Structures are given as C-alpha cells and as structure tokens.
From Swiss-Prot:
Keywords: Cytoplasm, Cytoskeleton, Microtubule, Nucleus. It holds the Pfam family GCP_C_terminal. One of its GO terms (cellular component) is gamma-tubulin complex. This is Gamma-tubulin complex component 3.
Length: 838
C-alpha cells in the first residue's frame, strides 16, 4: 500500500512538471522521455525532497486571518467574506477525501497569489526564486533576461539560486565531520542519559564513584561540550538514585523500626512523584527511538530527542528532584511533626512551581498528623503508635491525669502550628479524657459534634489537611469552647466544686465561728495532755460533737463526712496542741484541684489559724479570770499596806500586759480573717465565675491559696517574721500560765485571809500560809507577789522586745497588706516612738 502511494505521488509530480513546462512557448510539445524533461523532473524531485520550510509558524488559522485582513484593507469586503466562508467549510471538512495538511495548502495559495502580484507589477520574480524551466542553453535554465522577456512565470513556485543544492551538500559534509569527531552518536548518548536518569548504567554513561555522579567514560571520544552536557543532564539520575534509595531503605525498616506514619506518607508522596517521573521518561524513550535529523532537516521534524531538547524536558523534573533530594537529606533523622515542620520550611518559596509542588507534597505528608489532631480534639484519642504527635501521654494516677497525664512535645511541634494553638489542642483533648476517665461523663461527644458542625468540618477521617490552618484553628476554638464549658458545668453542678471550696473555707480556714469556738472549748483540755496519751478516735468524737452543737449540722452530710481529724507525726515531748489538725478528703475528680500538695498548704494554713485561735482563746480565758467582780480590795484590808500595794501593782501590770497582747491579737486576727481570707475568697469567687476552662480554674484556685499563704506569713520569704510571730504566740501562752498562777494564788490568799480569824486551829497543815499566823501569811503573800511581778516583768520585756522586732519586719514584706497591718497595730505611733527612744 505504501509503494502504491509513493508511485501515485511520483506520477502526480511528473504530470505537474509536464504541465508547467508545456506552458513555455519554446517547448510546447515536450516529450516526457526526453533527456531535458527527465533532468527537469529530477530537479523538481530534489526540490520536493529538500528540507526547506517557510520562516513562519504552521498555523492555518493565522494565515487565513492574514488573507482576510488583506482583502478587507484592499476594499474587497465581499471577497473577504466569501473567503472566510470558504475557509470555514474547508477547515471543518474531515474524513476521507479531505486535506490533512490544511496549513500547507493555504500557504501555497498565498505564495502563488503573491507571485502573480509581483509578476503583474513588473517585478523580476526570478530574483526571488528562478522559475522551473528548460532552456536551449546547455544547463537547461533560462537566462534572467530571457525569463524577463518571456514573462511566463505565471505564479509558478520559485526556488533558490542554488540549482545544485550546495547548502544541502555542505550540511551533509558537516554531518560527516561530526561523525568523524564522535565515536558515539548523539542518539546513543541520549538513550544512555535516559538510562542514567533512572539510576541505571548505560553503555557509555556510567556511575563514577570518584566524582559521585554519572558521566561519559573517559575512554569514549566525544567533544568536551557534549561531555559537560551529559554530566549536567545525568545529575537528574544522581538525584533520582538518592531519593529512590531513601524510599527503599525506609520501607525496608518498616515495621521493624519506627519509620512512623508521617515518614510513610512522605515516602508515598515521593513515590507518587517518581511515578509521574517514570511516565515522562517513557514518553522521552519513545521519542529517543526516532533518528536525529541533519541540521538542514531539523526544522521539519519534531518527534526526535537530542541532548539540547532533553535539557529542556529535564528542566522541571530537575527542580522537583533537587527539592526531593534536599528533603531526603533533611528528613533522614526526623519523624512525625518535626519532619512535617522541616518540609514546611521549604514551602516558603516565591517560585510558583516550587510552591505548588511543596504544597502537593505537604498535603500528603501532613495527612496523618492532621488526622491525629482531629482524633485528639474531637474524640480524645491519642493515636500515636510511633511517637510522632506533639501531644504525649504517660501513665499516671487518676488524680494526676490533668496535670501530668498529657504534655506537649516541643520537638514534634511543626512550625505551621503556633504554640498557642498547640496549647489549645492539648487542653481540648485533655478535657475530653478528664470527662471520660475522672468524671465518668459522655456528654462531651455531643459538644464535639456541635463544634465540628459549627466549624464546617466533619468528624470523619480526612476532614482536615495541610493549608487549612484557619479551619483547624476554628475547629479547635469551637471544640475547646464547648467541651471546656461542659467540663466546668459538670464540676460545678454534678460534683459541687463551689460548695466544697466553701466547706474548706468554713472548716479548714476556721470561717465557721460557732463551730470553731465550740470545738476549741471541748477539745482544749484534752489537747493540753501529752500527744502520746491522746486517741484520734476520741478527738473524732469531739469533732462530731462540735458539728452537732453548731450550725455546721445543717450543711451537706457528704461534705461533713469528708472532714476528719488528723494527728501529725509527733515526738515524746509534744502536746496535743502541737499535733492536732483537721483535713478534708478530696475524691475524684475534685482531687485534681485539691491535690496532696494543695491539701498540705491548707494544712499549714489550718495549723497557723489554729494557733492564732488558741492564743485568742487563752486571752479570753484570762479575761474571764480577771473580771473586776472576782476580786475586791475589801478582802485584803487586813494585809499590810506594802503587800497590798504589791498586789495592786501585780494586778495592774497583768491587766496592762493583757491589754497590749489583746490589742495585737485582735488586730492581727482581724487582718487574717478579713483582709486575707475574705478578700482572697471574694477574688477567687469572681475568677471562678470567669473561668473558661479547667486550667483557668486551677490557676484561680492556686492564686487564691498562694495569696492566703503569702499574706499569712507562711511563705518561704516570710520565715524570719513568722518565727518572730510564733515567739509572740508562745509569750502570750506563757502569760496565760503566769496569769492563771497569779489569780489562783490571789484567790487562795483571799480565802485564807477571810478564814484566818475563825479557823486558826483548823489550818495547822505544814506549809500552809495560815499555819504561820498573820505574819507568816503576809510574808508568804509578799514573796509570792514579788515572784509573780518579776515573772510578769520578764514576760513584758520579752514581749515588748519581740513585738518591736516583729513590727520592724512588717514594712520589709512584699505584700502591701502587711504594711497596712503595721498601721493598724501602731496607729498611735506608740511603738514607733518607743523604738526611737530605745
């Protein structure tokens, strides 16, 4: 069939030449078998077999538009419309009998039209392309003058002045010279470069370990420029080999080693890119099968592959492969979020090609990471087998689940997720787990579904991906808002967190006054005994009695049952006052707030307040003994005036010292109860209402407790002033002991003085004041009062000195409230003047 087509084409060419030559008046009846005609026919075949092409793009539509515009500018609008209609019909005709190369035919008609116009205008068309003709001369070509005289071109295609086609001969000689300088043809080198691009050694292009790359073997004779170009093109193979090796090694290590899901996704993304690369190489290999034409023929052939064309084809794959090789080097020792973050840094690029490529790669790589975020935020599930997520879980006790159960792993936090967003992600998942594990609550599922609906995402897998950071932040914000609100509602309503805080304030911080006073009254005598002789069960009975005798009996029974007596570790010399304390039992989930360390702080505050209450109770006891109606001066009329003066002086000294101590204790207790406890509670209540999540609640409670500890002089920085305060407490308790002895002695002296006249014979016991008579009574009374006065003076001096030291330390404290305490204690500047005189 192909031979028939060729013969048909040859016959058509012969007929065309015969008709053209027959138009020459000199040869009207030319014999087709004559030597002159055969020479002309061979010349025509040389023209047709040449590679000469026009210097315009093969665009039929452009040629047609050019012709239509030309007709329109010449004022031939009707011809332009007719041409446009004819061309539309011509271009739309397809199938058998239609012209395949429509552009060539339209271009031919254009050239014929231009040639005829040139002939009409008297131009020498042979100047452009001499006509094909047969003359009488020996070479068979008409002279230029004859052609002009005869003027018979009539639009015949004119060829160059090179009837012997010398340019084609020169091109062929150049091709022969190139072949002599190269042992290997360019087609072979192209195929070898394609092999090298797949990491395979070719026949002449092989991997050279010395230069760490592919290159033409030194023994092969090729031009230096060709060798350099092959080396540059083969860089793609070196990069491919690097990427392919990384993928293979990573897959070989899985699942024995922790490649991780992000690492697997990275390998899958690289493999997808290599698959596209393989497709490109398949296309190039198909083109490489076509021979490379000569330089003179190159313009008419498109489906061949040379080294220069290969460099154009390799431009885009080279950029991508270089990026992949850089990422492979960067990610060899990375995994999880760290790997995703490292890849993300390379996506910040101004080149659209690089940016789009990295975005496509990151969408695949970050898919497992975003799935972990979705699962954690909406389900509280930590699906992280290989430790790739930036949230890390660890086994802990239930009470430590919120504080220590989950932490951020900064090394695994990708750079496209901000630290604040990571904290919200961490807290949201923690809230779900806290509700599920500690609160035994499942209402979080509805809150998570509402959050997903509000953010426009789905609760199913694949709902989020790289490049959707705003959508992720919106989802996390909505989920955190709803789940945290649900968590606080559960704590406040179901577990009565506020009520428990108030119960601790009433009983551990001694805010329930009647309960504290009654407990102090009934337990005080028992606590004066040695600690080893006191039973905790007996003290628990006292506690229950105090509850029943006060308004505490109307509180929630569950909260009262949590209040227990605790005996602290003690030695042989400790009294009950030193070891007695109350504790509050915190159960799940409240033990997340009231941890052991928090309860230990409450214990310290209770012990401090209990000491303060004990001192206040002691001063009240002294006042009850000192009431004026207990002692009348008429009872001592029979005593000597000196002894009576000693008695009045001792009583007055005792009352003055009591007033000083009572002034200090009253103002200090007012400061503790109102400016410390009540103010701190008021602030805590406001912050508790404003809390948006459990972290806010924990921070508010910690701030509340730290404020109490700091303002109550229980902090580490207040150790010196606290020791000074405890010295004052000890002096007040010593004063209580001496005051009791004084009034016991006075009471006995009062009784003996009344009975001295009536019962002289009844009180003859050895050592009795009365047994020695009135003189002896007076002497013993004087000695007793003198001793008590000395003790009172000693306590007064120590108290004044200690109080002065305490007041001097108050202005040095950081808390402003303590400075106001100084103003309350020394509002008349009595101690300041006393200190300045001293």
């Amino acid at each position: 069939m192909e031979d028939d087509d060729q013969q048909k084409a040859a016959d058509l060419v012969q007929e065309l030449v015969l008709r053209l030559v027959s138009q020459n008046p000199q040869t009207p009846n030319l014999d087709p078998n004559s030597p002159a005609f055969l020479k002309t026919l061979r010349y025509a075949f040389r023209i047709l077999s040449s590679r000469l092409t026009p210097s315009v793009l093969p665009d039929a539509t452009a040629i047609a538009e050019s012709l239509k515009r030309r007709l329109a500018t010449q004022g031939k609008s009707s011809d332009a419309l007719a041409f446009a209609d004819l061309y539309t019909k011509f271009a739309s005709k397809t199938g058998p009998g239609s012209v395949n190369n429509k552009w060539a035919l339209v271009y031919l008609l254009k050239i014929v039209s231009d040639d005829r116009k040139s002939a009409i205008n008297g131009l020498d068309s042979s100047v452009l392309l001499p006509n094909l003709g047969i003359g009488d001369t020996g070479n068979g070509v008409l002279s230029r003058g004859e052609a002009k005289k005869k003027d018979w071109s009539n639009g015949v295609l004119l060829v160059s002045k090179d009837p012997e086609n010398l340019r084609d001969i020169a091109f062929r000689e150049y091709a022969i010279l190139v072949k002599e300088e190269n042992e290997v043809t360019e087609e072979v080198l192209v195929r070898d470069v394609l092999y090298a691009s797949q990491g395979i050694d070719g026949k002449y292009v092989k991997f050279n370990s010395e230069i760490d790359g592919y290159a033409v073997q030194e023994s092969v004779k090729v031009p230096r420029a060709t060798r350099i170009m092959v080396r540059m093109l083969s860089e793609l193979g070196w990069l491919f080999r690097k990427v392919k090796t990384f993928i293979t090694e990573s897959m070989d290590r899985f699942p024995a080693e922790d490649v991780g899901t992000v690492g697997q996704a990275f390998c899958a993304a690289l493999q997808d890119e290599l698959s596209d690369y393989y497709k490109l190489l398949a296309v190039l290999e198909a083109q490489a099968m076509n021979p490379i034409p000569l330089v003179s023929e190159s313009a008419s052939s498109n489906n061949y592959l040379s080294l220069r064309r290969l460099s154009v084809w390799f431009a885009e794959p080279m950029v991508k492969m270089r990026l992949m090789a850089v990422l492979v080097d960067k990610c060899k020792v990375l995994r999880g979020g760290a790997m995703a973050g490292a890849i993300h840094l390379h996506a910040q690029h101004g080149d659209p090609l690089v940016h789009d490529f990295m975005m496509s790669l990151l969408r695949c790589v970050c898919s497992p990471l975003f799935e972990m975020v979705r699962s954690w935020v909406l389900e509280g599930e930590l699906e992280d087998t290989f430790g790739e997520f930036f949230v890390v879980g660890q086994p802990v006790k239930v009470d430590l689940l919120w504080r220590e159960g989950y932490k951020l792993h900064p090394a695994m936090l990708p750079s496209f997720i901000s630290p604040s967003l990571a904290q919200r992600i961490l807290r949201t998942g923690k809230s779900i787990n806290f509700l599920r594990v500690c609160c035994d609550d499942h209402g979080w599922a509805d809150a998570a579904s509402e959050a997903a609906a509000a953010s426009g995402t789905t609760t199913r897998r694949g709902g989020l991906g790289y490049g959707e950071t705003d959508a992720l932040e919106h989802l996390v914000t909505e989920a955190a808002k709803r789940i945290d609100k649900h968590l606080l509602d559960v704590l406040y309503k179901r577990y009565k967190f506020k009520e428990h805080c108030l119960a601790i304030k009433r009983y551990l911080l001694l805010g329930q006054g009647d309960f504290v006073q009654y407990l102090m009254d009934i337990v005080g005598p028992k606590l004066s005994e040695p600690a080893n002789n006191i039973s905790s069960f007996e003290l628990a009975g006292f506690l229950e009695a105090a509850i029943r005798a006060s308004n505490a009996q109307y509180d929630d029974r569950d909260m009262l049952d949590r209040l227990r007596v605790k005996m602290m570790p003690h030695g042989s010399g400790d009294r009950g006052w030193d070891v007695f304390s109350l504790e509050y039992e915190a159960r799940v989930p409240l033990d997340t707030v009231f941890t052991e360390s928090v309860l230990s702080k409450y214990l310290r505050v209770f012990n401090f307040l209990w000491k303060l209450k004990r001192v206040e109770h002691a001063l009240i006891g002294i006042w009850k003994t000192m009431k004026p109606n207990c002692i009348t001066s008429n009872s001592f009329v029979k005593l000597q005036s000196s002894v009576k003066l000693q008695l009045l002086s001792a009583l007055r000294r005792c009352q003055v010292l009591w007033n000083e101590m009572n002034h200090f204790v009253t103002n200090f207790q007012y400061y503790i109860m109102f400016e410390v406890l009540e103010v701190s509670w008021s602030n805590f209540s406001k912050e508790m209402e404003a809390a948006k999540d459990l972290d806010d609640l924990l921070a508010a409670h910690e701030k509340y407790l730290n404020a109490i500890v700091g303002k109550s002089l229980l902090g580490e920085q207040s150790q010196t002033i606290r020791e000074s305060l405890f010295v004052l407490f000890e002096l007040i308790l010593r004063f209580r002991s001496h005051a009791d002895r004084l009034y016991e002695g006075i009471h006995e002296l009062q009784i003996r003085s009344k009975e001295s006249g009536r019962e002289k014979n009844k009180s003859q016991e050895p050592g009795s004041w009365i047994s020695e008579g009135r003189k002896g009574l007076t002497q013993r009374a004087g000695e007793f009062l003198q001793s008590m006065s000395q003790d009172m003076d000693s306590i007064a001096k120590e108290y004044t000195s200690s109080l002065d030291g305490f007041l001097s330390l108050l202005p040095l404290q950081q808390s402003v409230d303590l400075k106001f305490l100084f103003f309350r204690l020394d509002f008349t500047e009595f101690y300041s003047r006393l200190h300045s005189k001293g």
